[in-house]
Amino acid sequence: MSDRLNDQAQNRLQKLLNLKQTGNDPYLITKIENTHSAASFQKAFANQSDAELKQYQVILTGRIIALRQTFIIIQDFSGKMQLYINKKTAPELFEYFNNYIDLGDQIVATGHPMMTKTGVLTLNVERLQIVAKCLQTPPEKWHGLTDPEARARKRYLDLTYNRAQVEVFLKRTQIITAIRTFLNEAGFLEVETPILQAVLGGANAKPFKTHYNALKGDFYLRIANEIALKKLIVGGLPKVYEMGRMFRNEGVDTTHNPEFTSIEMYQANADYAVMMDLTENLIKFVCKTLNQWSFNWNGQTLDLAKPFKKVKMVDLICQVTGVNFDDVKDDQTAIALAKQHKVELKKHEQNKQHIINRFFEQFCEHTLIQPTFVTHYPKAVSPLAKQDPHNPEFTERFELFINTKELANAYSELNDPLEQRARFEQQLQEKRMGNDEASELDESFLDALSFGLPPTGGLGIGVDRLVMLLCECSSIRDVVFFPQLRELK
C-alpha cells in the first residue's frame, strides 16, 4: 500500500487493522460453502410465504455495492441480493456492521429469507463476516468507470461495476465454443503448434523477437501458425485447426492489439472455394447459436443472414476508381496511375501487383460494409498462395470484409516446393528493399513440401474482430480481458 493514503483509504485500512486485533482477520478464512447464488436465491424463495421462508438457513457471499441504513446490497456473478440487519434483535451484529463494513467489501452472510413490506426478497442476517476488505474507494455507483482506458487498465473493477462488459465476455466465450463445435462436428482435429519459431513466416507482419538461451539463438513469437499446420497436412492429417495467440509488433488501435486470438484451419483435397463456403457456414453457425443475424455498427445494419457477396479485387477497384488494371500491361503504367491517384508507394511496391493491392487498401476497403469476399489477390502479396491458373499474376485467395474490416483470409495453398522457394526468394529481395513484413526463407517448410503436400485449402479468422462484430463493440479493447496499454508514468 502507498504511504500517501487519502482519508477514506486510511479509514478503511484502520478498520482492517482493528479486525485483525479483535481476532476477526478476514484473510484467515480459506473456504466458504455458500448455499445459494443471487440468481438461485431469487428462484428458490421468491414465491414462498413468510412462514415457509423462516424455515430455511441460507449462506450468501458477494461484494457490497450499496449501503443504506440497515440494508446491504451485495453482488455475485449471477446478480444482486438484498441483506437486512435488525439492530434491535441483533445489536452486536449491527455494531460489527457499523464499525467495519464499507462499500466494496467481500462478505459472507448467514440468515433466513424474508420478504420486506415492499415485496423485496431479502436475507435477514444472523451472522456476517468480511472475507476480503476493500481498502480503496470503489467507483461511484451510478457512473462507475467511464474512461475506456481506465476500464481496460482496471478490468477487475470494470467487471464488478459494469454488467454490460461481463455480458460481452460471456458472449465471447459462447462464440469461441460455437466455432470449436462447428469445426469438431465437421471432422477437424484441434492441435497445438509452437509459439516460439526460429523462422519468421505464415504472414506478412513485424515480429516480436526473443533470445532462446538453451538453444543459443534468436526466436520469434509467432505471427501465424500456418507453416506448422501445413506440415501436419503433409503428415497425413486431413483436417486440422488451432485457436491461439498470435503476436505482431505493430500499432495499437481500435482494431489491432499486438497480442491477439486467431484461428487457422487447413483441409486436404480442398481449395479456396471450399474454404469460402466453410467461412460463410461457420459464421452463420455462430449467428444461429447466438440467435442473432443482424448487427448494428456505427449506424450501419449488417445482415449476416443473406448470402455473402463475392468480387474480384481488380473488378472492385474498377467499380470504385474507374481504373481497370486488366488493361495495365507494365509496371511503369501502374506507377503512373499510382502517382495520378496520389497513392504513395514504398521502394518494394514499385510494381503493378503491389500497386493493385495499394489501390484496394486506399480506395476500396472502406466501402465494404456488408459481408464481402474479395478474391484473386496479386501474387506479390500472397507468397504462400497458389496462383490462378487462368491469370498467373493473381492467386486463388480471398479475404472476407465486414463493415470495412478484414475478418478472414484464405487461399488454395501453394504446394509446389520449387515455386514456393522462388516466392521466398522474392520475399527476401523485398526485405532487402525495406519490406520488414516480408517472409523469410523457411528450409524446414520447403523440406516438408518436398515430401508432397496434397491440394489444400487454408483459412484464418481473427477471433477478436469477429467477437467485436457480433458483440457490436467499437474497440478491440472491449472484447479482450487485458489489452496491451501504454505504461502509466
Curated annotation (Swiss-Prot):
PROSITE patterns: AA_TRNA_LIGASE_II (PS50862). Its cofactor is Mg(2+). The keyword Ubl conjugation does not apply. Mg(2+) 1 binds at residues 399, 406. GO terms for biological process: lysyl-tRNA aminoacylation. Binds 3 Mg(2+) ions per subunit. One of its GO terms (molecular function) is magnesium ion binding. It is found in: Cytoplasm. InterPro entries: Aa-tRNA-synt_II, aa-tRNA-synth_II, aa-tRNA-synth_II/BPL/LPL, Lys-tRNA-ligase_II, Lys-tRNA-ligase_II_N, Lys-tRNA-synth_II_C, NA-bd_OB-fold, NA-bd_OB_tRNA. Keywords: Aminoacyl-tRNA synthetase, ATP-binding, Cytoplasm, Ligase, Magnesium, Metal-binding, Nucleotide-binding, Protein biosynthesis. It comes from the Bacteria. Its EC number is 6.1.1.6. Its main location: cytoplasm. GO terms for cellular component: cytosol. Belongs to the class-II aminoacyl-tRNA synthetase family. This is Lysine--tRNA ligase. It comes from Mycoplasma pneumoniae (strain ATCC 29342 / M129 / Subtype 1) (Mycoplasmoides pneumoniae).
